[in-house]
Amino acid sequence: MRLLGLDVGSKTVGVAISDPLGITAQELETIKIDESKFSFGLRQIRRIVRKYDVEGFVLGLPKNMDGSSGHSVERSKQYGERLKEKFDLPVYYMDERLTTVQADRILVEEAGVHDRVERKKVIDQMAAVLILQNYLEATRKDN
């Protein structure tokens, strides 16, 4: 079952895809969005859903460190509702606390990307990979 992992921000959505067996997650792309113009990148997501035969979405929930929800959590949930309405596919949520920090560390320490501008281009994709991979591992443990 192929899933699409999404790291929803205010200006971009990082996108990752699982392999067909749902074991690993790979980065795919970063989609620019503009909430003020009601531009949510759904055309790009439709293209990806069709190309990869996606069967569901995993969105990160950027909770505060104390576990409480803020504006960013609401943004992710609203985005999830848009996806449900548009694609009629299941939407799952995964706690994403510190995934961007972890993604930044991976890019610097493991991939050797020290240029901040270069990291910024792929940080959302890497965060989406971490969200999706964490979800895949958590659901595999439950089964």
Swiss-Prot record:
Nuclease in keyword set: yes
EC code(s) of this entry: 3.1.-.-
Record SUPFAM superfamilies: Ribonuclease H-like
GO terms under cellular component: cytosol
Nucleotide-binding among keywords: no
Protein function: Could be a nuclease involved in processing of the 5'-end of pre-16S rRNA.
Homology family: Belongs to the YqgF nuclease family.
Protein name per the record: Putative pre-16S rRNA nuclease
